[in-house]
Amino acid sequence: MQAFKEYWQKQKKDVTDKKQLLEALKLSFAKEQNKTFAFLIKNFQDGISNYYPNDQEDQSEAAKTAFGTQGIAFPQSGLKGIFMSEWLRKQLGEKAKINLDIKSLKVTDSKISPTIKWNKDIGIKRNQDKPYNFRFEIDIEYQGNYKLSWLEAIIAKFSGIPGEWKGKLNLKFIVDGDLSWEIVQKPDYPGSLFQFDDQKQQLLFKLHVWEKITVQEPEFMELIKSQNLHNLELRTESTKPPVVDLASYLHYQLLKLNQQ
């Protein structure tokens, strides 16, 4: 990271400035696309790990500058960070008011050498199948609970929702580049083509993600399985694959380096 910063300083670019960072990445991609992509993926993983120090969201100026007031795009914490139907989100969020506290977060690299099928003029071809080769996993352990009123519990039971729950919830994200060509070619899926947006100063990147949730309590686990949250491939609507500004994670890492 320090070497990256110092190299671009010699090229008269301050990569802690987002605009200049994107300019540096464009030049780097044109010369060494796979090496640059691997560097971005590494800092994507490290950025996720560093954003949750002591299992809490980073509130530093570096985090606010890199990710904005809304915070990190993926993975988010709590219920908002779990992909599910809007119906279940309403049941657990508005009615049950579920509480989820992060107890641990771990990012594990698969040791695959990241590669990208990218062209400096067009980015990713619209009919390209599986344009990226990389893989890593995010494991988040939550301690959570909720308790419905007796009347709400009776009503919820007909929908398969337990009246109360307390315990651990383990959330795993498997993240890779196995986007099908149908998703890559869709214009309403920003980030599929891996293009730089100079106006917004972003490098949008669409992820292919599997979400896997497990809990120990049988009744709550049955609800998880009924919603397919134990083995959910993010594809459409409320479970649409997340889009991140990949450059923001590297920017975050560089800003954190400045604070040391």
Swiss-Prot record:
InterPro entries: DUF237 (IPR004306). Belongs to the MG032/MG096/MG288 family. This is Uncharacterized protein MPN_511. It comes from Mycoplasma pneumoniae (strain ATCC 29342 / M129 / Subtype 1).
